[in-house]
Structures are given as C-alpha cells and as structure tokens.
Swiss-Prot record:
Species of the source: Roseiflexus sp. (strain RS-1)
Keyword Mitochondrion among UniProt keywords: no
Subunit composition and interactions: Homodimer.
Listed SMART domains: S4
GO CC terms of this entry: cytosol
UniProt protein name: Tyrosine--tRNA ligase
Residue sites binding ATP per the record: K233
Subcellular localization, as worded in the UniProt entry: Cytoplasm
Motif 'KMSKS' region: positions: 230-234
UniProt keyword list: Aminoacyl-tRNA synthetase, ATP-binding, Cytoplasm, Ligase, Nucleotide-binding, Protein biosynthesis, RNA-binding
UniProt-listed Enzyme Commission number(s): 6.1.1.1
Domain of life: Bacteria
Length: 424
C-alpha cells in the first residue's frame, strides 16, 4: 500500500473522492477534517466510522481535525433527513459539545508531533459571522441553482414537508467551515459519509471561488445491514458510546450478535485487524458459523477500543452468565443488564433475613415449581441453580448472603430457564 486510500479501498471505505486525491496523498501529508453533529450528549456507534477514518489518516502521518458542530448544530443538517428536526437551544448544543469532546479525544493522538490531532468547535467562528458578511462572503459565491441540484436539498424539495430556509442554508455554513479551516489551518481535505458529498463539494467550490485554491473531498459508504434494517439501532434504541447510556455489556452484545453476512464487512470497517486476519475469520465463519468466532473477535476489538480492557473483561464475564458462568463478580447493574428480559418476582427482604427463605417456597412463589413435591424432585434431580451454582439440597434456605449487592438472586431451572428474584 502506498497511501491511506489503498487501505480505505481494501476495507471497502472509499465510496467517492475528488480527482487528484491519490496524487496529493502520495506527495504530501495533509490536514483533513470531519464534522460531528452535537445533537445528543453522547456519540453513538454511527460515529465510529468517521472517528476511525480520522484515526486511520493520522496513523499514515496526516493531521486530523475533529470538528464539533457547536455552530451548525444550532441549525441542523438536512442531509439524509426526510423532515426538519426540532431546534436545540444554544445551551443544550453547548452542553452536548462539551460532553462529546472527551469521546472524540479518545480516538486521536494529540501529542503526535507535527501531525497531532486538533479538536475544534465551529461555534468559535460561525457565531461571530454577521449576516451581512455571510451574504457577501459566502452566499454570493454559490448560486441557488447549484444548491438545488444537491441531493440533500432536492429530495426535500419534492417532499410534503419541504425544507426551511434555515436548513437550506446549512450547506453554506458547512462550506464556510471548510473554507475557514483551509485558510487558517491549511486543511485541504474534508471527509464524511456518502450523504455529505453535496455539502463537501460546496465547500470545495467556495474555496476555489474565494481563495483560488484546490481542495478535496472523500466520502465513505453509509453503514448498512444485510437484512435491510438500520445499523446501530436495537429494540431499546441507539447504541451509544457513553457507558451510562449503553452499558459495556450491551455494547459487547450488539457486536456479538451481528449477522454472519455482515461480520466480515464490520471487521473491515470498525477494527484495526489486517486483511489476512479478517479473511481467516471469514473462512472460519463460512465453515463453522455456530462458533461465532468472527463475531466474538469483532465484539472484543470494538469494546476494548471504546471502553477499555477492564470493561471488556467485565462484559465478557457478564456474557458468560447466561451460559452458566460465574456470577460472583457481577454487580447489581450487571444483573439488570443481563437478566432484564427474563421473568422476575419481587419477594420481601424480611423473608431472607435470619434463617432465610426455604428454597422450595421460593420456587413455588416464583412459579418455577407447581407444587412442593415438584420443587423437591427438581432440586434432588440437580435441576435447580442459585446464582448459576447447582443446588441439590432440598433443605436449602436462601439468605441475603445469597443476593447480589443485596438486591438480586438469580435462579435457573435446567439449562436455560432463568428467573430473577428481586429482594424488596
């Protein structure tokens, strides 16, 4: 491989790029930027591709700029949207920018000498731009005809909801960002998802018209799933990078449950593994799909990258719990995550105090056994587990010492029938 573009090509990440970009990257190291929309107080897995694109460029010796959209976030990007989004307050956008800065920073190296990463906020220049200056210095150079030809605008023009002047002007603001970064930071390249191509080329045109210079664009494909459903969404919503919003366990499980048809592509997109390593994992998936070797590697790589080694270890321990693994090191929060969807029964705390609650009675109260004799037979037959430890003692009494953080006891009948006892 001679340039970063060669790596992006074999990973399937080069959707479209400006003419001459190959030659530029062959002869010089460049500064590039990608913008991040602060529409929430956390990034989600849909942001991993842009984050990793910046990181990949930096590993090739280029200088990445992560641009938080504190200014453009006040307007809202119409690209890929079928209707206008509600405007966030200035205070909310500013708070979101501060919240995502740390997530942006963890993927980039800010102490890499002459190609150290930069973290900027376009509110620093957009909020100082007067209306008159904007109309004279930006609006003058891009015709309405030019803007209407862009997919992000044209698709909205033909919809019932249309497009407001506010969102229509977003393209000009993003173009101004590119021109500003070109002039003040020597930024020659903007990257983004394929739905950003129109906005990126508008910036290239503005730079050509106002500065008489050549700039470049590059877009990667939008992430898709083989079954046609939206990537990054689960039944409970988006998969966030913030562990308070999506726990490391659920984050790990998202990647572990990726379909066989998608896992090879996602290994290329979201990890640093080599082509040889990925091809070997694909061969294993083709011959022994039940092992889920590729999915496990994907889950490990991405969880480690986002949450760190300690969180990965806890996520893997938690993942084993549903397959009979030890619960000894799990917290109450882990239990809620893992057993959220299993049947549960709340029993009074006082019943577990003193000598404790007879296991036979607990099984009856939870509906795991239909009668005391049924409970006794199941226990004696080795079919009952307390916190995944087999319990063949019919005289066993459960106490608070059996509970996890004083809140939960996990019962299991046979191999798969779980029941969560909540200590009330």
């Amino acid at each position: 491989m001679t340039t970063i573009l060669d790596e992006l090509r074999w990973r399937g990440l080069l959707y479209e790029s400006s003419d001459g970009l190959d030659e530029l990257l062959t002869r010089e190291r460049v500064t590039l930027y990608i913008g991040f929309d602060p529409s929430a107080d956390s990034l989600h897995i849909g942001h991993l591709l842009p984050l990793l694109t910046l990181a990949r460029f930096q590993r090739w010796g280029h200088t990445p700029i992560a641009l938080a959209g504190g200014g453009t976030g006040l307007i809202g990007d119409p690209s890929g949207k079928t209707q206008e989004r509600p405007l966030l307050s200035k205070e909310q956008v500013a708070a979101n920018v501060e919240a995502i800065k740390g997530q942006l920073a963890q993927f980039l190296d800010f102490n890499a000498g002459d190609h150290s990463a930069l973290l900027l906020n376009n509110a620093d220049w957009l909020t100082r731009l007067s209306l008159m200056d904007f109309l004279r210095d930006v609006g003058k150079h891009l015709t309405v005809n030019y803007m209407l030809a862009k997919d992000s605008v044209r698709s909205r023009m033909t919809s019932e909801t249309g497009i407001s002047f506010t969102e229509f002007s977003y393209m000009l603001l993003q173009a101004y960002d590119f021109a500003y970064l070109f002039e003040h930071y020597g930024c020659k390249l903007q990257a983004g998802g394929s739905d950003q191509w129109g906005n990126i080329t508008a910036g290239i045109e503005l730079i050509r018209r106002t500065l008489g210079q050549k700039a470049y664009g590059l877009v990667y494909p939008l992430v898709t799933k083989a079954d046609g459903t939206k990537f990054g969404k689960t039944e409970s919503g988006a998969v966030w990078l913030d562990p308070k919003r999506t726990s490391p366990y659920r984050f790990y499980q998202f990647w572990y449950n990726v379909d066989d048809a998608d896992v090879g592509k996602y290994l290329r997109y979201f990890t640093w593994l080599s082509a040889d390593e990925i091809e070997e994992l694909e061969r294993i998936t083709a011959s022994q799909p039940e092992r889920r070797t590729a999915q496990q590697r994907l889950a490990r790589e991405v969880t480690r990258m986002v949450h760190g080694e300690t969180a990965l270890a806890r996520a893997e321990e938690a993942s084993q719990a549903l397959f009979g693994g030890s619960l000894a090191r799990l917290s109450a929060g882990d239990v809620i995550d893992i057993f959220e969807d299993v049947p549960s029964t709340t029993l009074p705390r006082q019943d577990f105090e003193g000598d404790g609650f007879p296991l036979i009675d607990v099984l009856l109260r939870c509906g795991i056994a239909t009668s005391k004799s049924d409970a006794r037979r199941t226990i004696e037959g080795g079919g009952i587990y307390v916190n995944n430890i087999q319990c063949p003692d019919v005289g066993r009494r459960l106490t608070l010492n059996d509970s996890i953080d004083g809140q939960f006891i996990v019962l299991r009948k046979g191999r798969k029938q779980y029941h969560l006892v909540k200590v009330g």
